[in-house]
Amino acid sequence: MSDSENDYSDESSGSEYESPVKKGKSAPKKPAAAGSKKKASATRKPAAKKATTTTTSTTKKSTTSKKSESDNDDFSGDDKSSSSDNENVFKNIASSAKKGKSIEEIYQKKELLDQILLRPDTYIGSTERQEEELWVWEDKRMVHRKVSFVPGIYKIFDEILVNAADNKQREGNMKFIKVVIDREKGFISVTNDGAGIPIQVHSEHKIYIPELIFGNLLTSSHYDDSEKRLTGGRNGFGAKLANIFSTKFIVECADSKSKKLYKQTFTNNMRSKEDPKITSYQNKTDYTKITFYPELDRFGMVEFDDDLVALLSKRVYDIAGCNPTLKVSLNDEELGIRSFEKYINLYFPDEENAPKVYYEKVSDRWELAVTLSKESQFNQVSFVNSICTVKGGTHVTHALSNIVTAIQEQVNKKNKGSADIKPAFIKNHLSVFVNCLIENPHFDSQTKETLTSKISSFGSRCEPSEKFIKRVLDSKSGIVASILEFAQFKDQSALKRSTSSGGKKGKVSIPKLDDANLAGGTKSEDCTLILTEGDSAKSLATAGISVVGKDHYGAFPLKGKLLNVRDQSTKVINNDEINNIVTILGLKYGKVYETLSDLRYGHLMIMTDQDHDGSHIKGLIINMVHHFWPTLLRMPGFLVEFITPIVKVFKNNQKPISFYTMPEFLKWRETNDKGWDVKYYKGLGTSTPGEGKEYFSDLERHKIDFEWDEGANDNIELAFSKSRADDRKKWMAEHIEGTFLEQFGVKKLTYSDFINKELVLFSIADCERSIPNIVDGLKTSHRKTLYSCFKRNLKKEIKVAQLIGYVSEHSAYHHGEASLYSTIVGMAQEFVGSNNINLLNPAGSYGTRIAGGKDCSSARYIHTRLNDIARAVYHADDDPILSCVVDDGKKVQPKFYIPVIPMILVNGCVGIGTGWSSTIPNYNPRDLIQNMRLAIDGKPLKPIKPWYRGFLGSIEANQGSKVQGGQYLSKGIWKKLSDNRFEITELPIGFWTQDYRELLDELETPGTRKKKKEEKEKKAASRKGTKAKPTTTKRSKRVDDDDDNEKVTEATVKSYTNYSSESTIHFIIDTIQPVDEINIEKVFKLVSTINETNMVVFDEEGRIQRFATTTALQEHFFPLRIKHYQMRKDFLSERLSEEYSRLSNKARFILAVVNKELVISNVKKVDLINKLKEMKFDRIINKNSNKSARDKIKKKKNAFDEEDAAISSDEEKDGAQEEQDDDTKGYDYLLSLPLWSLTLERVKKLIEERDSKKKEWDILLSTPIQEIYKRDLDALEKALDDQDAYDESLKNQTESLKKRTKTKALPRAKKISAKVVKDTKEAPLTKLVKPTVKIPTTTDSNVSGSKRKKSDDTTSTSTSTTTSSNTKPIESFFAKEDKKPTPAVKKSTLVSLDSDSDFDDDVVVSSKPKAPPKKTSKVIELSDESDQESDQESDQGSDPESPPKRSKAPPKKPTTIATKKATTSKSKVIDDKSSDDEVIKAPTNRPTRSRVPPPKSLSFLDSDSDDDDLYDNEESSSDSD
């Protein structure tokens, strides 16, 4: 039995239209009932306080319960609580039966009208008085206050009012709505001049149409769901409900077409009706007027009270605001509202602190306004087809989706340190007004408080303009600021809770912490915690602590750099590093410390490397303490740093000199360079434990106390606050090069000095690593890599792993292999969107556009070399004129290379440094070549636009962009194939194939990305051993809740097919809607933006500059390039002049020696030098060291290649050189000539070379630098032609291979036989038996035939005992290989070995003997403990623990090999004299033995191994032991 069956038990009889309530009551009882209802509502006041303007909580269950208490007295008996909806129905039936009620009296059927009157909640809401916070019309404005009203009477009025408004949608010429609320007479009338109701008799129902629609239930003109309507009516109740709950209901209709006026009166809750009065009507205007007298007694009312009138008046103003073209009047007073925006202003009239309201008419069907909510809770006033949806619905969610998303992005951008702000959190700070027209709307009930229609059925979309969204996001709105402020408040509260149990403790257990013995005790203030940079530094600190004692000193290693905690509250809570420090020190968030007695340590000592990164770590620790506990920094002696040398110099037995800063060392070296050995201490790990003990033994000289100063507060914020990025730019620009801190022996250091003299050096170095140079377009890591490749003359391919080591060694690279690996790979990549000119050659898998290069192979698998075009870009003749950087005491890469064209525009860049970031697109090198030629000729440069090698799409200027600077649109390529199908053959720049597949999956199945993200988080959490944070709540989703995937709420893609390769794009997509109805470029993201607004670079002087246009950048580059061409010409001229003099002097010298004018034998060195001076031979000191190196290369070229020669010459230059005095150095080129060159033939050759050099010199002097530049541009253009030809050849190769390939798919796998299926089913999966491998051995050839037969039989027996039925498929496969197997190998898994055989590394090789074995083969199963156990075991003798030696008899037939399939051990066949059938298992703890190599005639390669493993095995076969 259901509750509904019990609802009719209070009525036993009566007329069909007699009111059930009137029958059972007497007149005096009604006021008492009303009074009791008021008292009941008063008891629910606390619940009413929870109501807001957006949620009119009708408390249906409560009202239903009370209704049953008042109306069901006959049913319920004395026990009033038994009538509750939650009581057992059967108890009520039993109670009624005891009172003598019959079954017919208990189970009743009601007519619909009686049921509506008896149970009105479903149709009009509660008929009991209740109190709620609502908007009402009062004092000529909208007021939000507590209202006492009856929802039912409010609803019947709303039905009539909305019906009048619906006429506006049916009849566009409708002009007015007139509403009269007569409090004295107790009636309400609503009049509109819309299209009149036809005054004629309905042919089916035989009554007039007005009577049909106003006097009969379930009648409506809205039952055709195929018709698109923008009205509020739907179910056929509407105005009839007002008739039913009225004592009198008058319908008056004027129809100008039939010229009739219709008037009819209904009474007694629509049960009684008068005959319609039809008169003549001559006016041209139709109208409909409804007048009704609500049955006040039924609603517990005596009259229209003030609250009800205020609430009904508000609804009249709603209609006026939603229909601004209508003249709406209330009690004959026109309201004068001509727009929805003006209506919204009624909510904020003349308030000083009124929030700014942002309004936009999105379309003819959507109007939207947003403002800040003062109550920090979501408020909404919304209308659907003039219906006031007090609880919102899907229309509010949809209208706000784009706005909430934009606010979310903005807030998360400014609040990066905290958890992502959810849409529901943002909505709590908004007040929104929505007025919309929805096709055929669906509501949660007849009360129409909530819209439930799907967004796809709205018939229109609400997409606010970007201008409107920007206004909402503007700081003046206060919305973003309010959300940020509240989010930060929550974060601070969470921080305080995270350390609520912290404070001073005895012992703490944290991994890697070496706690001081007295930490956390009474003497904790005397204890010092040493924070070190890594584990190796902690080892050094531990060694030092052994000197000063462990009672007062503890050590804890940091994992790299600490988090910048400013604006990072949520990340701080989840940061293990910071939490550990807080726990170790005993700190509490939010506590203001005035003494150190509450902490576990009274001092915090920072011990980091003395390099730039070490300075940064110090600064981050200072920043953390300053942000959370600033008073600690003011306490002298709390924060301390420990300094160690960065450089030490040694000389003979003198005491080493230590330097604690690089500028300090460089200054010393200017005057003390000779005879000193230099050792660089780049990290604390360079120091030995002994040196660590020395440092701590002199602790007072190695520690520096930080001291608070007046500017400390501002300087710390300057260095670490995100809001002061512009100030940091100025801070770095004002730094004077060469400024450094005097550290050793200094007792105190102010925070301002640390920030401005030490930390600033890190910020500058960070920018140098991250931002490229305008001259060569390279960052420091790229430049070091290119320098090393040029130095090595890298024309042969080497592994990237090898190159990483070479770069680290020869260019003093200090930042780890992973960083250098990404640099090298990035310089070699050539897929679309990477490099226009790749300077390194990608030999191997360097990544593709499938994953944007992330799918590259490991450094040990890929090779590289210098690309041929590299030297066309960076000409070798420019190398000698470049100034080099000194690092680790040696010259390394130049400050910048000087390319032929501005490479900064060729390959572009993306980089983020301290205070600066840079983003430069790629451009066509041919455009740059053309512009350089124009600049040479003195002509203006042509504008260029971004260009990407291999990109097939278009790049166009964004004409509508308001961004300062250039902006371009990168567009992919798509083509319509049919009405619901199109293909994509190119993606915009920066969109990779895998990313695009994920987008298509999302468009096909919305929510896919979210599910993948959740799965990823769960996996990450499982690896960490923690629970993944839920991304969704378990509560039921409300219709006004935001969806995380609002942007993709419905499927757009039906299916798609991917034909893309590693270099091409090809998707064929089938859509649900026709292609023409979809904005393909927007929905499928086929357009991306490319900006020229952040082109930041270092100039040639090391200053950071921002360029507004590419033209300005080229104009800056060109004069610099011309200057260096002049420098190149001067250098080459000087070198040719030197060569000319050298050759001339050599010829004179040899002639003088040959003619005996100069005697060089048995002459003192001093006399010889004086003689050379007397003969006026030129002193030539070799300034151009590169020249001698090249000469050596040329001499050695025949012996080995250029790369080896370059390395060799470099080693010779770096080797020890003989010290010479100045006089000898000048004539060394003469005195070092070999004796065999002192001939006349040599003189002749030297004179020819001299004349050739003179000619070359003259040509150089006569060639203008502009001509030299043009030659280089021609050479580069030729190299680009070769690059284009290479790209074209790759395309042609793919096409030709496609045509050549005949097989499109592999042949299908063949079905297995029924016998195999049966055997497989019979063999239990848990007892897999490995195939037995037999190695037949040879014995004496004179063995008798009987013995041979016996041996064969024994072998067969042995085989059968060790071979399972599940090896039959293997046997059948191998049977094809050995057509004539010998008895010794019968039923074994032996495979013929020929030249084409491929097999695994774990094999047993055996040779078939000339004669059968003398002894029976025995099977031994060896443990697979090591793969190194091999055939050598057969040489160990006949002992069971040592297999017999392999027969040396040469094989008569091809050797066979036994493969090991899915087994964990190896099987060997040996001879055994004691037993023919015994199977022996060798012990698993047998010592590993080296593998015996196979016979030379059986050399083979494992098909599954790669070459590297092969070479490694060959080179280190002995290592297997």
From Swiss-Prot:
One GO BP on record is: DNA topological change
Which annotated residues bind Mg(2+) 1?
E533, D609
Show which residues form the site (Transition state stabilizer). Answer: R860
Q: Which cofactor does it need?
A: Mg(2+); Mn(2+); Ca(2+)
User: Any idea where this protein resides?
Assistant: Nucleus
Q: Which CDD domains does UniProt cross-reference here?
A: HATPase_TopII-like, TopoIIA_Trans_ScTopoIIA, TOPRIM_TopoIIA
Q: Name one GO molecular function term.
A: DNA binding
The protein's site described by Important for DNA bending is found at I912
Active site annotated at which positions? Y861
Give the note describing cofactor binding and stoichiometry: Binds two Mg(2+) per subunit. The magnesium ions form salt bridges with both the protein and the DNA. Can also accept other divalent metal cations, such as Mn(2+) or Ca(2+).
Offer a single GO CC term for the protein: chromosome
Record keywords: ATP-binding, DNA-binding, Isomerase, Magnesium, Metal-binding, Nucleotide-binding, Nucleus, Topoisomerase
Q: Where is the Topo IIA-type catalytic domain?
A: 771-1273
Assembly and interactions? Homodimer.
Which family would the database say this protein is a member of? Belongs to the type II topoisomerase family.
Protein name per the record: Probable DNA topoisomerase 2
Gene label: top2
